[in-house]
Amino acid sequence: MAALSPTFATSTQDSTCLQDSEFPVSSKDHSCPQNLDLFVCSGLEPHTPSVGSQESVTFQDVAVDFTEKEWPLLDSSQRKLYKDVMLENYSNLTSLGYQVGKPSLISHLEQEEEPRTEERGAHQGACADWETPSKTKWSLLMEDIFGKETPSGVTMERAGLGEKSTEYAHLFEVFGMDPHLTQPMGRHAGKRPYHRRDYGVAFKGRPHLTQHMSMYDGRKMHECHQCQKAFTTSASLTRHRRIHTGEKPYECSDCGKAFNDPSALRSHARTHLKEKPFDCSQCGNAFRTLSALKIHMRVHTGERPYKCDQCGKAYGRSCHLIAHKRTHTGERPYECHDCGKAFQHPSHLKEHVRNHTGEKPYACTQCGKAFRWKSNFNLHKKNHMVEKTYECKECGKSFGDLVSRRKHMRIHIVKKPVECRQCGKTFRNQSILKTHMNSHTGEKPYGCDLCGKAFSASSNLTAHRKIHTQERRYECAACGKVFGDYLSRRRHMSVHLVKKRVECRQCGKAFRNQSTLKTHMRSHTGEKPYECDHCGKAFSIGSNLNVHRRIHTGEKPYECLVCGKAFSDHSSLRSHVKTHRGEKLFVSSVWKRLQ
């Protein structure tokens, strides 16, 4: 909703300044300023006061009040509109330079509390003209916004409102009003009821008035030069610029943490309060504010009121929707000052900055090892815990998590109808077979644009390119082994997560499952069940037979990421990589990957 402030309403036929004779000054003493030597919304020419001295605008001039009987009649949407208007009015006064002390009403609204009865009626004694028993005060709130009285049906007389009635249609719906009411009524019979100096917003000069009026006609005159985002007020632009500059002028007095917006500081200050009076009836979690409890309840109810207009995806919190929308717009407002890299979310920038600072905020309480990323820390913690193992029923292989076992099960479930005629290997489809055939023919169709090296598989080319870009590697938090991608490291972590429960009675070695122990026992018995069809040579382990067969087929699936040379077995590749040591700084990371 646009920023709303109570303003003077003028007829389209008469937009001139109001005369003093239209405003009889009561002899009673009250706090509403009757005469201000300022520009007002009802006219653009200065007006000279005839009575009294110049007075400043107070919060009472822009406040709307409710009695104890009227407040319960408002529904939640009406109360929300009341809160938004009051907070925005107070913000407008302070941003325009008025020295306005914070009323207790504003303090309660900022704390997500309902205003107390005495605070809602605190302003009623200030202006005798506000006593209107024939209508509710929320009608006055709508008069502030639209310049008309709603329940009795007052004419829509504000200048330029006729063209914008559709723009404010949703507000009429909120208050159950008919936007086409035209019966002329007012607070004072025979006079324009809204041409009142004691009830409106006044400005020191034309620039302030122009800025204020832009909030009503939808103009956004203040544009950010960095991202071209536009705002209706300069104060909003100033707050937005802090995202780019990193300025955080609002500091917490308790812990020293700084923020770029006062509302963020207020939310943070509540974390220091020990009292959490709002309890969740379903899970027992406690919260400091009622609004926080309401947001939390969406976890249980499944309510997702914030929906994306482009893809229809819904979220339980507005901040999550704002972050999601950046995936459509491509906006990356959070920029790193060290390298210039931009991010869509502040948490992503925070994690990225650790690459420059070397900060490792996640420390293990058991062994003292520190980590830069929370994901690595969580994986490391599992090393200290006894994890349940997930074993494959088909082959007996065990995994540290259910997801890894599910991925492994595809090996047994998926049929492999395509067979290689040279080595007898089977594959799921022709494209995989075609890539495999390159290991027999020696064809290397995937060439590096930077150094000209060629590879038989596209995945090997992708891994090779990381040598040129010095792309960050994925290191195992438990043993330090380095991997070229996240999935490879995740598969490797199952080695550390799975408890070795089966022990060999002859040599004392421990293994993860019975199938691994069974293979190991052949080293003691001398059994060699795997025999080569070409030469009759036998092996105790099936993988050794597979390596041996490559001698007959000529298959060389292991390629060097540095020079592209291929080998039939992994150990030969490891020996070859040692010859590159000293040639390039990146070879050390390649060597680590082969350990």
Swiss-Prot record:
Coiled coil: none annotated. Disulfide bonds: none annotated. A zinc finger (C2H2-type) spans 222-244, 250-272, 278-300, 306-328, 334-356, 362-384, 390-412, 418-440, 446-468, 474-496, 502-524, 530-552, 558-580. Isoform 1 and isoform 2 are ubiquitously expressed. Isoform 3 and isoform 4 are expressed only in lymphocytes, spleen and lung. It comes from Homo sapiens. Its main location: nucleus. It comes from the Eukaryota. Residues 57-128 form the KRAB domain. May function as a transcription factor. May play an important role in erythroid maturation and lymphoid proliferation. Belongs to the krueppel C2H2-type zinc-finger protein family. Signal peptide: none annotated. InterPro entries: C2H2-ZF_domain (IPR050752), KRAB (IPR001909), KRAB_dom_sf (IPR036051), Znf_C2H2_sf (IPR036236), Znf_C2H2_type (IPR013087). It is found in: Nucleus. This is Zinc finger protein 317. GO terms for molecular function: DNA-binding transcription factor activity, RNA polymerase II-specific; RNA polymerase II cis-regulatory region sequence-specific DNA binding; zinc ion binding. Residues 109-128 are annotated as: Disordered. GO terms for biological process: regulation of transcription by RNA polymerase II. Keywords: DNA-binding, Metal-binding, Nucleus, Repeat, Transcription, Transcription regulation, Zinc, Zinc-finger. One of its GO terms (cellular component) is nucleus.
